A protein has these predicted regions:
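Domain-level signature for soluble enzymes in the chorismate/prephenate branch of the shikimate pathway
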Residues: 1-282
């Protein structure tokens, strides 16, 4: 029994052209769906175009089902551009980026996650980013988790109820070789709906640092993300799972010796997703 003959290069190129045309047609079809979505939202009185929970779910599903020779980095980047651009079409906005610790890593991250259609505004400091988001109609801000010692307790500016809040932690699919793997927070004006609340971010003020804090918080599933001196003691930025009650966080800190504990929620985001064990070529 002889093997079936391989297709010619001409036939393969025709198939590739047909696939490309289909992909373009599907993108245009997606655009028509977005047109309808915009019209429905107008009739219903509007609503935020940002859906952090949905975006996180979409990116994880894409990463989990991906197979073949096309790198996951490429697939993730394409979908981030698609999602972010169509969000921009629904609600034009800019992304404010803190480049105080270096322009290249933050710009790479901004362009990977938000594409090139969404305007990117650089600021030399966290305060500029927070102010830009507060003063913009639909703007987003992007801040490195490690904003540097000069940033101080920057998260305290997010404490007022109407101040911008953390809505996402990027990248959605974490892995050691991620092309835009710098851990960043995305901030926006408080969302009425569509927010992810797997991890709650708390601004904590207390008397001083104690070495027992990290272990005490780890025992309840919480984590210290940042710490800085404050005018009346110490300021911490803490992430706690939504299943961990605020009272449990307070009790853990008090049990570790803390005094004068005060807390304010400054945002929330989807649960982190470890993509290091994915096998896209399997």
């Amino acid at each position: 029994m002889t093997d079936a003959p391989l297709p010619s290069l001409t036939d393969l190129r025709k198939e590739i052209d047909a696939i490309d045309a289909d992909m373009h047609a599907l993108l245009m079809r997606r655009g028509r769906v977005i047109d309808t979505l915009i019209e429905i939202k107008k009739r219903q009185g509007g609503g935020s175009a940002f859906r952090p929970l949905r975006e996180a779910q979409m990116m994880r599903a894409i990463a989990e089902r991906h197979r073949g020779v096309l790198p996951l980095d490429t697939v993730e980047g394409i979908w981030r551009i698609i999602i972010s651009t169509f969000t921009y079409v629904q609600a034009p906005h800019s992304v404010h980026v803190d480049v105080a610790r270096g322009d290249a890593p933050m710009r790479d991250s901004a362009r990977f996650h938000f594409g090139y259609t969404v305007p990117c505004v650089s600021h030399h400091g966290v305060a500029g980013v927070i102010g830009g988001v507060a003063n913009g109609a639909n703007d987003l801000g992007m801040l490195a988790l490690d904003a540097g010692p000069g940033a101080g307790a920057w998260w305290r500016a997010l404490e007022p109820p109407d101040a911008p809040k953390i809505i996402a932690r990027l990248p959605f699919v974490e892995r050691p070789d991620h092309p835009a793997g710098l851990p960043v927070f995305v901030i926006a004006k408080p969302l009425a709906d569509g927010a992810a609340r797997d991890e709650i971010i708390e601004s904590v003020r207390l008397d001083r640092w104690r070495d027992a804090y990290p272990a005490a918080l780890l025992a309840i599933g919480a984590e210290i993300i940042g710490n800085a001196g404050a005018e009346t003691g110490l300021a911490l930025l803490v992430s706690r799972p939504s299943a961990c009650a605020l009272d449990a966080l307070r009790a853990a800190l008090l049990g570790a010796g803390a005094r004068d504990v005060r807390m304010a929620e400054v945002g929330a985001h989807a649960a982190r997703f470890d993509g290091s064990q994915l096998r896209p070529n399997g």
